[in-house]
């Protein structure tokens, strides 16, 4: 194993839950404004998960006041306080870009049921 890979493994976080595209997640982000620090939640559907060791990222999409908002987060970012999986979705694609063109009830994702 080379030196760069070893350094990347040290920087990685171990408290990340297992989630996939189609899942609804709540990402708690640590925001620093001047001397103050607060935590803001961003809840939406995971439309993409990009691999890699320390460069892994995921994109979350939500509808805010009728406008679609997408944010891409690095998985191992120190500014992410925690990630909560709200619901598991059942999809057959790895990239859910088709949700961008859908509105209302057509943009719903089936919930994965445990049997």
Swiss-Prot record:
Q: Could you tell me the keywords of this UniProt record?
A: Ribonucleoprotein, Ribosomal protein
Q: Which PROSITE patterns match?
A: RIBOSOMAL_L19
Superkingdom: Bacteria
Query: Annotated Gene Ontology MF terms?
Result: structural constituent of ribosome
* GO cellular component assignments: cytosolic large ribosomal subunit
Instruction: Tell me the Pfam families matching this sequence.
Output: Ribosomal_L19
GO BP annotation list: translation
Q: Which InterPro entries match?
A: Ribosomal_bL19, Ribosomal_bL19_CS, Ribosomal_bL19_sf, Translation_prot_SH3-like_sf
TM spans (from-to): none
What Gene3D superfamilies does UniProt report for this protein, alphabetically? 2.30.30.790
User: Which NCBIfam families does this chain map to?
Assistant: rplS_bact
HAMAP family from the UniProt entry: Ribosomal_bL19
- In UniProt terms, what function does this protein have? This protein is located at the 30S-50S ribosomal subunit interface and may play a role in the structure and function of the aminoacyl-tRNA binding site.
Which family does the record claim for this protein? Answer: Belongs to the bacterial ribosomal protein bL19 family.
Q: What is this protein called?
A: Large ribosomal subunit protein bL19
Q: Which organism is it from?
A: Syntrophus aciditrophicus (strain SB)
Q: Which gene encodes it?
A: rplS
């Amino acid at each position: 194993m080379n030196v760069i890979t070893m350094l990347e493994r040290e920087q990685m976080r171990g408290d990340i839950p297992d989630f996939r595209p189609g899942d609804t997640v709540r990402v708690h982000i640590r925001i620093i404004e001047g001397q103050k620090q607060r935590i803001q939640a961003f809840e939406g559907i995971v439309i993409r998960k990009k691999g890699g060791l320390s460069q892994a990222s995921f994109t979350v999409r939500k509808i805010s006041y009728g406008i679609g908002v997408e944010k891409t987060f690095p998985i191992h970012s120190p500014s992410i306080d925690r990630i909560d999986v709200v619901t598991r979705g059942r999809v057959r694609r790895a990239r859910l870009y088709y949700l961008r063109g859908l509105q209302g009830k057509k943009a719903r994702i089936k919930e994965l049921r445990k049997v």
